[in-house]
Amino acid sequence: MTDTETETESASPERHTSPGRFLGRPLRRVLRRHFGWLPLYELRNKIRYGHTVPRVWLFESAEVRRLRATLPAGAAPLVTTVIPTYRRPESLPAAVQSVLAQTIDDLRVIVVDDGGGGLPELPDDPRLVTVSLAHNTAVLGVVRNVGIRLADSEFVAFLDDDNEWEPEHLATALAALRSEEPDQRGQRGRRLAGVYTALRRVLPDGRELDVLSVPFDRQLARNEGFLDANGFVARRSRALRFSRLRRDRGVLPREDWATLYRYSRRHPIRHVPVPTVRYLVNPDTYYTVWDSIES
């Protein structure tokens, strides 16, 4: 689900407004050097939109309680994939099928409909669960959080409804995730909390644009928006929750960067340089927006 496909996608009048736009160049350079632009954008978002979070958090929690009672009984899978969706019938079935076609079988797919009024016909597979929110939230983070909180697996993964995975995506990510992150001396270090694979970015006409493969560097992430949930696989934990801020079109950074950057502060993350995600690029996608911003 692209971040802009909500009922209020044109509501934001502040497309690409930089928090340093009205500051002098020397001050902007100092702020960027010490903090990075993306944390400053996110601080602005929290100040402007933080008052909306309590309401959507209450709705999220109520929906989790309501929907949990509808889930099928059975043993917990190894990994749950959360697919948020909103009125995307033309691409959702292919996204779901790409998860069901993974080389590992011990999985579950939870499709969370953001009050879109119904879902298209999807593959008949007992590993697929679909739920619908009581009404449209237009907050991608809330939709993903409902899926995370409904999961009972050891690991969770994420895929948008217009993207697809290669068959070995989960196997590749889980193999890396189950390894240990070595410390600076090459000794056994902390257990990895999450990994993200490379994205093969594809244009609407099917041509490959490029492969986005950036090793994790928290300092670099302060100024470059390379963190994306579609390649991210993590150990399920209470700490892993997506941002609940409402982000209409033009509000930056997006949920993926805000969530993974914050999560990486206390949880080791590593990049797996294998392109296992087929990521559709169009004029409204996350990366197209970021690539157009003047730094």
Where do the PLM segments sit?
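Conserved donor NDP-sugar-binding/catalytic core segment of glycosyltransferases
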Residues: 170-209
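Acidic donor-diphosphate engagement hotspot in glycosyltransferases and nucleotidyltransferases
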Residues: 91, 144, 165-172, 205-207
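Short aromatic/hydrophobic "clamp" motif used to bind/position activated sugar donors
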Residues: 156
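The conserved acidic donor/metal-binding loop of glycosyltransferases
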Residues: 160-164
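Conserved nucleotide-sugar donor-binding catalytic segment
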Residues: 216-295
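Glycine-rich, basic loop-to-helix element that forms the pyrophosphate-binding segment
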Residues: 134-151
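Acidic donor-binding segment of Leloir-type glycosyltransferases
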Residues: 96-137
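N-proximal low-complexity "stem/linker" segments adjacent to membrane-targeting elements
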Residues: 14-15, 19-98
